[in-house]
Amino acid sequence: MENAGALQLLSAAAAAVAVVVVVALRWLLARRAAGGWKQRPRLPPGSTGLPLIGETLRLISAYKTPDPEPFIDERVARHGGVFTTHVFGERTVFSADPAFNRLLLAAEGRAVDCSYPSSITTLLGARSLLLTRGAAHKRLHSLTLTRLGRPASPPLLAHIDRLVLDTMRHWEPAATVRLLDEAKKITFNLTVKQLVSIDPGPWTESLRREYVKLIDGFFSIPFPFASLLPFTTYGQALKSRKKVAGALREVIRKRMEERGEESGATEEAESKREKKDMVEELLQAEGGSFSEEEMVDFCLSLLVAGYETTSVLMTVAVKFLTETPAALAQLKEEHENMTNMKGENQPLEWSDYKSMTFTQCVINETLRVANIISGVFRRANTDIHFKGYTIPKGCKIFASFRAVHLNNDHYENARTFDPWRWQSNHKLQNEVGANLFTPFGGGPRLCPGYELARVVISVFLHHLVMRFSWEAAEEDRLVFFPTTRTLKGYPINLRQRS
């Protein structure tokens, strides 16, 4: 009897449980059908690595070598072109997919906003061109384009020509120079001139030395109390940032005082006054001038952009040409033919620059293989859906241009320097249109100084091949962290051409 009673109780309990399960399942299915029950977002696959550190150390180790590609290659092979990792203190979705990169660049200010590691944000300043958003960024971008986006201006082209020649005149007829250092002198002095109209001298050289320390801190890890420890890379960078900002602030205050003394000028006369540099553009901007701190951050960030990126490209282009004799020979022939047509010792003009067709192929290929801008950081403002995955709102995203540029599916022998691949008239247009070639970014944040950078590199290569022959003084190699550069600054032995 007891057994029979127990069996009945068990049967009743099982029936009750079954009813509860059925009711619960029906309720859950109904909620899901009505949209009231949301599935957890399906993130792109990947690994977040070690606690707190994530995969940051692996990424840094890879990018401090001449061949950083395995870091992304291995993850793309395992997870696909969009994968999840954890770097620089937070979970990050990496994209090596040109279609997703195109989406991110076009969605700036809507689905995504720019977002960089805290070390960069602190060192550049919140009001810098790289970090401002919305209407503020649009205004600064427009001003930068006005000042730096017109390299065809005869005075600007003449200044670039003169600055390159002045630098090379200090080279001995037979000497060893560290090319990256010399290229940085050119780009830094050019940018300072465009920003504050100060010619090369002790002030600019002192400023440049501090800039070197500032840039070294960009991708350092700002661990707690690092700012209080001056012996750390980040601590030194913060100290140099204060010095650079202070030097720029003095110049800006002096200009503001001078404008105050000239306040009697009519509004019409003021509008016709030539804006000699970027500070003048900022002080006379439509809609009112900028605050002192806005101008300091803005000028500081433009110095970083003009100083570092173009000088590295100049150096790497020479390295690639030295290692590719056929390309160097064709480049020399192009510039010798141009010089023979216009005559020696004649200043370069815009028509000369436009005739340097193979030079542009060399620049394109240098940008593709070893661009200093390997990609851009963004942060999702809303959930982003792509190929069945969901990148949730607030997630950090890195669009890797380098991964696309060096993908054999997009470029034949992608990791070989081959400037002839750009000789097709439609190659550049097609690659840019498909977002396979994005050395200057894209969308609303397309680099406003990209044409100026091309002009500076072209003028530099022209005078180098026409005045000197050279060879590598010692073996040097590329590394890619914190930015692309040659490990030793690429020293070369020069011989002046007769």
Swiss-Prot record:
Heme binds at C447. GO terms for molecular function: heme binding; iron ion binding; monooxygenase activity; oxidoreductase activity, acting on paired donors, with incorporation or reduction of molecular oxygen. The keyword ATP-binding does not apply. GO terms for biological process: anther wall tapetum cell differentiation; brassinosteroid biosynthetic process; brassinosteroid homeostasis; pollen exine formation; positive regulation of flower development; response to UV-B. Pathway: Plant hormone biosynthesis; brassinosteroid biosynthesis. InterPro entries: Cyt_P450, Cyt_P450_CS, Cyt_P450_E_grp-I, Cyt_P450_sf. One of its GO terms (cellular component) is membrane. Disulfide bonds: none annotated. Its EC number is 1.14.19.79. PROSITE patterns: CYTOCHROME_P450 (PS00086). Its cofactor is heme. Gene3D superfamilies: Cytochrome P450. Residues 257-277 are annotated as: Disordered. It is a single-pass membrane protein. It catalyses: (22S)-22-hydroxycampesterol + reduced [NADPH--hemoprotein reductase] + O2 = (22S)-22-hydroxycampest-4-en-3-one + oxidized [NADPH--hemoprotein reductase] + 2 H2O + H(+); 6-deoxoteasterone + reduced [NADPH--hemoprotein reductase] + O2 = 3-dehydro-6-deoxoteasterone + oxidized [NADPH--hemoprotein reductase] + 2 H2O + H(+). The keyword Transmembrane helix applies. It holds the Pfam family p450. Involved in reduction steps of the biosynthesis of plant campesterol-derivative steroids, ending to castasterone (CS) but missing brassinolide (BL). Catalyzes the conversion of (22S)-22-hydroxycampesterol (22-hydroxyCR, 22-OHCR) to (22S,24R)-22-hydroxyergost-4-en-3-one (22-hydroxy-campesta-4-en-3-one, 22-OH-4-en-3-one) and of 6-deoxoteasterone (6-deoxoTE) to 3-dehydro-6-deoxoteasterone (6-deoxo3DT, 6-deoxo3DHT). Belongs to the cytochrome P450 family. This is 3beta,22alpha-dihydroxysteroid 3-dehydrogenase. The lineage of its organism: Eukaryota, Viridiplantae, Streptophyta, Embryophyta, Tracheophyta.
